[in-house]
Amino acid sequence: RWVLIGAAPSVQSHVDRMKSNQDRVVIFPKIPFKDLPQHLSAADILVIPQRDTTDTQGQIPAKLFDAMSMAKPIITTPLSDIEEVLGGYGYLIDPSNPDQLAKTIEYIFANPEEARLKGLNARKRCQELYDIKVLKKELNLQIEKLATTNS
């Protein structure tokens, strides 16, 4: 079963046209942020599709860090610095290639141990590099450096 969170209303009309898929697709246009971990933890795979637009260039979606923290396999696109943030612990696809998305999902289900390890390593990477405590410490160090070089 597919669960789409944050899907545009137009997605529902596509699902409605595919009668055979209606029972297999659940759409939540928007959910409260506090409910997000519950939904993400129920997933087998987290997909974060980013299109290559002027809006997404240079942007790292916050949901990437949410996904990494859940220790689940992540499928996303190699736009901006997403590939660097994941550090090899995700599956990268061409944003304009739905067949590649389908094949990657099939691959993950055919290789569950690899997918599990990528998810766990993504979580570890997120904790070591992107946790708020780590970032706060690094920011304070940089501020101290600036303060001492300017005095």
Please identify what each model-predicted range represents.
Residues 1-14:
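Glycosyltransferase donor-sugar binding loop
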Residues 12, 30-34, 61, 98, ...:
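Structural motif corresponding to alpha-helix initiation and N-cap regions
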Residues 12-37:
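Nucleotide-activated donor-binding/catalytic signature segment of Leloir-type glycosyltransferases, i.e.
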Residues 38, 113-144:
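A charged, aromatic-enriched C-terminal amphipathic alpha-helix characteristic of glycosyltransferases
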Residues 91-98, 107-112:
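Conserved acidic donor-binding segment of nucleotide-sugar-dependent glycosyltransferases
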